[in-house]
Structure formats: structure tokens, C-alpha cells
Amino acid sequence: MKKLLLISAATLIVSNSTFAGGILTNTNQHAAFLRMLSRGATTEIDGALSNPAGLAFLPKDGFHVGLSIQSAYQTRNIDASFMTYNGVSATGPTVADKPFEKYYEEPAAAPVIPSLFAAYKKGEWTISGFFAITAGGGKASFDDGLPMFDASAMAGIFQEGLKAEKPTVITPDMYDITSAMDGKQYIYSLQLGLSYKATEWLSVFGGGRMNYFTGGYKGFLNAIVKGTDTNLLPLALDCDQTGWGLTPVIGVNAKLGKLNIGAKYEFKTNLNIENNTKNIEYPRTPEGEAMIAPYKHGVNTPNDIPAMLSIAAAYEFLPVLRASVEYHFYDDKNAGMANGKQKYLTKGTNEYLAGIEFDVTKQLTLSCGGQITDYGLSDNYQSDTSFSCDSYSLGVGAKIKMNKHLNLNVGYMWTNYEDYTKKSTNYNGTGLPGTNVYSRTNKVFGLSADYSF
């Protein structure tokens, strides 16, 4: 039926969050985070992001800068199994004895992720800022398409064959489907703010962050009848998207002897992205026009950055031994997403972090840490083009004091994701049962240089 063909078309014209891999805010902007994970109570230069109020307690007046380079490598995988039609009986279409099975793997690589931090301290006042890619999924490719492409196309082609002037049974073994999707998504952020040391133990921060979104995707689907040039379902998409939004940020830091407590709140960012659609090919029907209307050139789609709360505490047990614990809450459920997708979340995202560092010598510090991420996922939220998985991360690394002005940080973070299984009795609108198992991998390496003068 035409609806299934239109579903296939719409799956190519995916939402703006496709290649972000679901709910994503990049907190790993500095190698110090990778090596320890809990940095929400730091008073070092990476605090420009993680604890800006804490920069009022920088050890000396003057300029403090940090440059970080990271390399991130991910895969997003879908193990799909779904039924297909294979013929017609007196009672209607018949279903194949065995499901169609295929493993879809999407590599995503960001070999160079730069971040720049800076602060100037003078007495009780500190002005600070940073530039970084604070959200987005980098670049990604599904070279073999997606299950939703294949399932909708197979069912749609079968139904259309039966409705032809001369009804024909067209089964998946009679044609070859080729499909692919390439995408990119980045949110570049520039933050500026001011910290004030109100008392010997208390400081506050206020500032703002400008966010610029840039992304795009290209995709196609062809279903060529074997031995011919006949294309049963030509689909194509070439679209870029841009947008911007402002994030107010406030923070507070309390330094109580060996205990330091840092807190930060980032308000929700209202962000709309605008389509710059260069090419769309789809079935030219009234239904098709209605379905692709939100994705035409010039149309805006919500892509809010959720409000975020961070609370952390660090304690110096010994002059050479320090530890930190931290909590993050992302209010994803109240952040606008394409098609109101946020309403399918059961809750916001909770993160629990902890880290420890030990000074082996005056020049060398070793550290490690862990993070647990708990999303409020549901079957209606998860899709082939945008899915998340609960996870835990481990980080390890070192800090090297080169001299009294220069410190180097090196860190490695590995994330283990919990598979998410989604079963459906109406797989991608085909009317047939199917199952997807979503999984991910993630590895990040980083090197940072911090300089004070």
C-alpha cells in the first residue's frame, strides 16, 4: 500500500537527532575528565565547563589557559529480525516461514575534537570561558541502510504489486535493495562568564553560552528488479540543517578546608534548526506531500538542549590522595524534540560519577574514575535513526607537571552499553512482527595542555 512506501520515504528524511545517537550532551571536553570522570568540584582550568564558580579559587592571579584534543570512536549497531510476505492465499497475503535477519553496523568517528579553555583571575574576580563541541554525534554512516528502510520497502513493494492492474506477487528474492545514510551533527559552543569570591570559602558564577548547530544527512534507497534496470522505489535525500540558541549558566562553589563542593545549573536552551533541503525524491502523491512537509526547505524543527544540574564534592584525604563524587540530572523530558518525541521518555537522565587521584611523585599523578548513565527509555522513544542505551564508563589516565607553568593531562575512557531489545507486532508499519536489538560501543582518548602565567 502507498502508506508503506511513504513510510520508506519518511525514514530517509530523518529527525535532526539521528546521528546524535539519542540523548547526548558531551561533558568530556578535557582529558582531566577522561582520566577521572568526576570533575564537578575541580578548581583547575577545566572547571570553566564543569565548575566555573570554582575558578575563583585558582591558586594565583593571572591568565590560565587549556587546550584539549580528543579522539572518539563509536559504533551504533542494530541486530534486526522481521517477517516478510511471500505470497497470496485465498484468505490474503501469506508470511514467510523464517524471518529476514540482518546485522546493521554504523561506525562513527571523530578523530580530532578540540576544546579551548581560558580564565583571567584578578583578586576576587575571575572571568572565564571555553569553546568546545558540547553536543552532537560527529559523523556517521549506515552503508547498508537501516532495518526500517528495508522492512517498509519490502512490505510496500509487495502490497503495490497486488494492487497493480495485473496483480503480481513481488517477493524480496526478486529484487535487490541498496540503501545508505550518511550524517553529521555538531553543536559548537562558546561560553563566557564571571566568578566572584564572596567570602573566604564561597564563590558564585553567572554566564551564558552561545550554541551553534550544524548538521546534515544524505541518503538513498533503490529497489532494482533482478536482471533489469527497473527501480521499484527510488528515494533520495540531501539536506543540511543549522540553528542557534543561548544557554544561561549559574554556579556556586564552597571551599570548606579539605572539602570542596561545586554546583552548576544550565537552563534549557530553546534551539530550532532550519532545513536547507537540496534534494528529496519520494512518491509524488498527496499523502507523500503531507508526510514530507515538515522536512522541506526552510522548515524549522525543535532540537532543545535540556536543562542540566550538576552537584559534586571533592575531598583531600591526604596531601597526595584526593577523591570526588558527582551527580548529573538532564531534564530531557521537558526539552523539545522533533515530533514531540520527548513525551515518550519515562524520566530525565541521571548520571552518577566518582573519581580518585594519587600523586605518585611531585611531577606525576595517576587517576581513575567511573560513571553510570541511566536514561528514561521506552520502546516508543527508541528508533533505528535515534536510539540510546544505558551504560557505565571507566576512565584512567595521568597528570604530568612539566614545570610550574605547564601541566599535561592524558586520559582514556571506555563505555560499556546495555543492549536494548525492542519487539513489535507491527514492525515499522508493515503489519508484521519483528525485533531490533540496539547496541553501541564507545572509546575516547584525550590529551590536554594547561598553562598558567
Q: Which sequence ranges carry the predicted segments?
A:
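Alpha-helical transmembrane segments and their juxtamembrane interfaces
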Residues: 12-13, 61, 360
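Low-complexity, polar-biased intrinsically disordered regions enriched in Pro/Ser/Thr/Gly
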Residues: 2, 86, 428-432
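Short stretches within intrinsically disordered, low-complexity N-terminal or propeptide regions
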Residues: 11-12, 89-92, 253-256
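A broadly conserved detector of short glycine/acidic/proline-rich loop/turn motifs that flank catalytic sites
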Residues: 10, 69-71, 412-414
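Outer-membrane beta-barrel porins/channels
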Residues: 21-38, 42-43, 113-115, 119-453
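Gram-negative bacterial Sec-dependent N-terminal signal peptides
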Residues: 1-20
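N-terminal, post-signal peptide beta-strand-biased segments of exported outer-membrane/organellar beta-barrel
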Residues: 16-133, 387
